[in-house]
Amino acid sequence: MRAVSGVVRKKKVKKILNMAKGYYGSHSKQMKQAKEAVIRGLKYAYRDRRQKKRMMRRLWTLRINAACRPLGISYSKFINGLKKANVIIDRKALSNLAIDDYKAFEAVVEVAKKALA
């Protein structure tokens, strides 16, 4: 008897079409278009999981810089001052501090300024 790939093929098609749910037009209905769209989507997902980390760090830096400028210090000098003062606070925490508790952030900036002077 001839071996056919009926069951396996149906399972593969179903898997791809399930992954392509919500895609527009033939990308969610036809196997070839769906497979191409899913592969492209997975490539973007892989790439963007890595880019997300870079983008978040850039956002934190931007926020810290924006909070430092009115207090008369640039971002680079602020970070340098923190390093000299042996203050170990990561950029995410500093960013949250600048947004949520500005008074505490001002105190941290003063510590950095004293270390630079």
From Swiss-Prot:
Pfam families: Ribosomal_L20
SUPFAM superfamilies: Ribosomal protein L20
Keyword GTP-binding attached: no
Gene Ontology terms, MF aspect: rRNA binding; structural constituent of ribosome
Keywords: Ribonucleoprotein, Ribosomal protein, RNA-binding, rRNA-binding
One GO BP: ribosomal large subunit assembly
GO CC annotations on file: ribonucleoprotein complex; ribosome
Function text: Binds directly to 23S ribosomal RNA and is necessary for the in vitro assembly process of the 50S ribosomal subunit. It is not involved in the protein synthesizing functions of that subunit.
Family, as annotated: Belongs to the bacterial ribosomal protein bL20 family.
Identification of the protein by name: Large ribosomal subunit protein bL20
